[in-house]
Structure formats: structure tokens, C-alpha cells
């Protein structure tokens, strides 16, 4: 927020040439006086073309097409479709809660080949436990999949800054990726474990979060929906998050976790890629950082920021 169209496109370019793949508008970014939508699309296209030429790798941008009315939403979609992007290099981000389910379904039916990115801004009004008549993150995620979303934010499973328990977020992610469910929650073995056996209770609750729980819940006719993870993550938290999720079948979008790198966005993207490489090679990021300066700088910066936050925490 706050960048002009060309400045925003420059940040996209820096992320892409740093090794990143997927850039998104955030939920409040649309058509602004200082960042007109048409110019933003134009400059992002130029930045993407340059990054693809330099890296030899495909890149993706998710454009926020949310609008106060139907005509404007479609106008933005058509602007992107006609901008000359390669197929598969753009997505439509829709604020599904505020724009409404009709907007999500309209995008899916009009643009069957486009990745529909469901941003869940304002979901907390429904999914937080403080609301006695709301619904869970699992229900929201399944609604989004049913409406045709290709991906939806599912939370950070207790690792990032987003509210939500690991069990809640993992269950949502697992369910929108599944095609068929069998076995009701109350028939699972963990339901009969004595409550005073904490070790076993913890084990089976973790197992529960990673398995399908709804019996009459076949999704064989529905395409999978990709979990999108964002909110308070950075390169030092990538492995802890993957360990909790027990898999890498997700998209992660890091804002400050990338742009706040001491050397800027390009170095932040490189640090994230290096953290991923370390995980794939089963090397700790501390060891991998000895030969990868961007990752070393990220570890130093985010570790310092974490310690400062703990010192300033009024609970301490």
C-alpha cells in the first residue's frame, strides 16, 4: 500500500528476479488515485516479461479484482485478460467475504481457466470463537471450494501471526485438498483415549488434524482447492510451518517476511528460496546460511526482531 503503479511493479520485479514465483495484490489494493488500476496492470506486465526473460522461469501475479459493483469487477478482469499475459501467469484475487459468494461463482463461471484466489478478509467476524453463531475456518474453506475457488487462505497453524489453532488450520487445509472422506469423527480411535493420558491425547489430536473427518463428504466431482498461507511468516519459520503441516502442498505469500529483509525485496526473496532449499536438502538453515549470505542476513534480522518483540511484550 502507498506505492505508485510503477513502484509496485518494481517491487514485483525485484521479488521475481530474487527467485520468487507468486506475487499478489493485498485485499485493500484496487484502483487508487496514486496507483491507477490500468497502469498497475500495464507495469506489472512489463515487470513480469523482464523477469521471465532474465530468469528463464515462469512467474505469476494475482490481481485483486474485487470491486463495489459487478460491472467494475468484470471490467478489471477483462483488462487483465487483454493485457497480453501468458496463460497461467495471472490469477484473480477476490475478497470473497466482502464481495460475496455471487462474485466468486461469477468469476469461476466466466473464467473457467483462471486461478481464482479467495482472500478471506473479514472472515474473523464469522470464524472467531467469540462469535457464538458463526462458522469455522473449515466450513469457510469448504464453501470457497464449492463456489469454485482455486485457492484460499487457511491460516498459519499457530506459526505465524494469524489467529487459529494448528488443528483448525491444518484440518481446513487437508479438507480442501481431499477428494473423498470416510469415517466419522466419533468413530476414530482417539475419541476413546482416556483424558488423563496426555501423551496419547496429544498424539491422536495431531493425527486427527491430518485426516479427513466427515463421512458423507465425497468431493470426487470437485477440483481441489490450494491452501494459501500468509501472515507473520518469514524464512526462519518456513521449516517449522512445513513440519506442522506435514507437507508442502500449499502456496505461501510473505509480505514483511520478504520485503523487510535488510538488503531489500530481492534479497528477501533469495533468502526464502534458500530456506526452501535447506529444507529440501535436510540441512538446518543455520548451517545453510554459512554459504548463503541472504539467508544469514534474514536469520540475524528476524531473530533480533523476535527477541525485541518478546522484550516489549507486556506479559513478560
What is the predicted function of each stretch?
Residues 8, 37, 41-44, 73, ...:
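Aromatic/hydrophobic pocket-lining residues that form the small-molecule binding cavity
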Residues 75-77, 84-254, 263, 267:
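Catalytic alpha/beta core domains of metabolic enzymes, predominantly
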Residues 52-61, 68-81:
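N-terminal active-site wall of soluble small-molecule enzyme domains
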Residues 1-20, 27:
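Active-site-proximal, glycine-rich beta->alpha crossover segments in alpha/beta enzymes
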Residues 22-27, 31, 51-58, 185-193, ...:
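Flexible, glycine/charged-enriched surface loops at secondary-structure junctions
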Residues 15, 241, 272:
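Conserved, mostly hydrophobic/aromatic
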Residues 20-42, 156-163:
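Glycine-rich, proline-tolerant flexible connector loops at the mouths of alpha/beta enzymes
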Residues 165, 187-206, 265-316:
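Extended, intrinsically disordered, low-complexity segments
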Amino acid at each position: 500500500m502507498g506505492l505508485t503503479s510503477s513502484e509496485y511493479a518494481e517491487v514485483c520485479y525485484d521479488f521475481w528476479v530474487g527467485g520468487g514465483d507468486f506475487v499478489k495484490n493485498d485485499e485493500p489494493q484496487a484502483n487508487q488515485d496514486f496507483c491507477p488500476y490500468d497502469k498497475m496492470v500495464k507495469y506489472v506486465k512489463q515487470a513480469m516479461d523482464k523477469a521471465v526473460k532474465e530468469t528463464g522461469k515462469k512467474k505469476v501475479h494475482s490481481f485483486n479484482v474485487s470491486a463495489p459493483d459487478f460491472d467494475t469487477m468484470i471490467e478489471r478482469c477483462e483488462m487483465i485478460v487483454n493485457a497480453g499475459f501468458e496463460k497461467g501467469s495471472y490469477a484473480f484475487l477476490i475478497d470473497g467475504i466482502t464481495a460475496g459468494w455471487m462474485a466468486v461463482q461469477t468469476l469461476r463461471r466466466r473464467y473457467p481457466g483462471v486461478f481464482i484466489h479467495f482472500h478471506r478478509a473479514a472472515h474473523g467476524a464469522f470464524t472467531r470463537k467469540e462469535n457464538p453463531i458463526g462458522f469455522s475456518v473449515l466450513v469457510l474453506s469448504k464453501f470457497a471450494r464449492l463456489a469454485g475457488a482455486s485457492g484460499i487462505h487457511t491460516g498459519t497453524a499457530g506459526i505465524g501471526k494469524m489467529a487459529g489453532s494448528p488443528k483448525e488450520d491444518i484440518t481446513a487445509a487437508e479438507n480442501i485438498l481431499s477428494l473423498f472422506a470416510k469415517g466419522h469423527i466419533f468413530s476414530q480411535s482417539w475419541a476413546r483415549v482416556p483424558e488423563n493420558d496426555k501423551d496419547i491425547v496429544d498424539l491422536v489430536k495431531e493425527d486427527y488434524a491430518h485426516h479427513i473427518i466427515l463421512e458423507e463428504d465425497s468431493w470426487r466431482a470437485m477440483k481441489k482447492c490450494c491452501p494459501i498461507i500468509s501472515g507473520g511468516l518469514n524464512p526462519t519459520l518456513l521449516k517449522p510451518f512445513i513440519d506442522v503441516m506435514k507437507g508442502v502442498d500449499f502456496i505461501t505469500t510473505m509480505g514483511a517476511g520478504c520485503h523487510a529483509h535488510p538488503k531489500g525485496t530481492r534479497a528477501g526473496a533469495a533468502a526464502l528460496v534458500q530456506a526452501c532449499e535447506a529444507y529440501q536438502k535436510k540441512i538446518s538453515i543455520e548451517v545453510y546460511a554459512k554459504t548463503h549470505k541472504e539467508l544469514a542476513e534474514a536469520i540475524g534480522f528476524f531473530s533480533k526482531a523476535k527477541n525485541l518483540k518478546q522484550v516489549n511484550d507486556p506479559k513478560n
